[in-house]
Amino acid sequence: MWTLINASPDVTAQIRGCEDLQPEAGELRGTPISEILLTNADLDHVLGLFCLREGRKLQVHAPQTVRDTLDAGLNLTPMMNAFCGIAWHEPPAVNFGPIEREDGRRSALEYRALKLPGKPPLFATKERTDGTHSVAYQIVDRDTGGRLLVAPDVAACTETLMQAMRESDAVIFDGTFWSEDELLRLKPGSRTATQMGHVTMADTSLSILRSLQARHKVYTHINNTNPVLSPASPERALVEAAGIVIGRDGLEFVV
């Protein structure tokens, strides 16, 4: 069984492109995806849930604030209950806890959600400043001891996040923007990276990731304005020289 972190709008294409995510032969509308962990309520991270509505009940892990935002803005729980149903799970926030399967069995994985600074998504019907709007997930394999940190939306690098990055064997990190004014230079009046809730590679994350001892360091959530997407760019050369991989479809590594 597999754990999915966020469900993007192209989740069905991702499933079709991954042999391990195919249903068992003869299984009607089956899936080896056991649960979905949401890092926040952004549309790019949740629209794929609607594409998964025709199978068994969805097991979704997310902070209560994220759940409330999705129910208020997208009517998610009632809508899903009209199809496959949805079961919500509150992730542990301090100590690692087991990922329990729908059938009651425990996964070999344990996890915890690290609270990050963040704002509600644009579709939110009411601006809330309380609660946890964005998290990173740190996951440990009890069989191997390997640790993975997944942080696709980082508005600021808290000390808790920094410590988790230092102790992880693999880090998948927010690579949305290279520079603070990336969008502004293309379209005057656009928001800055900070206003959109992202640290930049040039000012923050590149030096941090370079310093880590993790075996695998990967940038994800990369905006199409980011010059690192061009293999010949000087920005891409800096990233690769730091031992960081640009995330891509089909990328695999073992923790």
What are these regions (language model features)?
Residues 1, 96-112, 141-148, 255:
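Beta-strand-turn-beta hairpins that frame and shape the catalytic cleft
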Residues 1-41, 47-56, 157-164:
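Pre-active-site segment of Zn-dependent metallo-hydrolases
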Residues 1-24, 130-151, 170:
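Conserved beta-strand hairpin/beta-sheet module of binuclear metal-dependent hydrolase folds
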Residues 4-8, 32-44, 63, 149-154, ...:
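Active-site neighborhood of phospho(di)ester-bond hydrolases with catalytic His/Asp-centered motifs
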Residues 31, 84, 107-109, 166, ...:
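Structured loop/turn residues at beta-strand edges in well-structured enzyme cores
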Residues 63-135, 244-250:
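Metallo-beta-lactamase
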Residues 132-134, 142-147, 155-251:
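Cap/insert and terminal regions of metallo-dependent hydrolase folds
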